[in-house]
Amino acid sequence: MYPDNHYKSLVEKKLKDLNLTSTRTFKYSSNPEVLTGEIEKLTNYSQRKKNLELRKKMFEDKEDEQSLKQLERLEQLYTLGGVNFDSVIIIDFGNSLKSVLTSLAYTDVNQEKVLITTVNQWFDESIFYENTIKNLYYPSINYKEFK
């Protein structure tokens, strides 16, 4: 994933040079208002939300204990079903990166099943105080020695 900004040509060239297989690239808007809609499409959010509503309707009229437990469990969810990717590498930083992370959390991307990695984060301590993504991986250095 990378933003559609003035660095996109460089990112696209480097990705092409890597000659990666079994990957998809996703270019997104730097505008946070547009970004969430793009991430919703990427994650199939609308369909997963509909899946949940349909499943809940299956149990709403039932009175047996197992159906009630199932409905109670479903009420705790935001969507039903996973996304069609197992990892994401985000080539971004700063507030734009935070917007992407927030959109991934909003669209109910399961952090237990999807590895989220960024390449430009070690220098921005503010990301440590964000609570939208708990399992974020990034390359690092010995920060004390760097300073």
Regions found by a protein language model. Name each.
Residues 3-4, 93-95, 121-122, 141:
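Solvent-exposed coil/turn segments that connect beta secondary-structure elements
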Residues 89-91:
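Structural motif
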Residues 6-10, 34-37, 41, 95, ...:
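Extracytoplasmic/secreted proteins, especially bacterial periplasmic and envelope-associated proteins
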Residues 16-29, 35-72, 83-87, 101-147:
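Extracellular/periplasmic periplasmic-binding protein-like sensory domains
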Residues 1-25:
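Extracytoplasmic ligand/sensor domains, especially the bilobed periplasmic-binding protein
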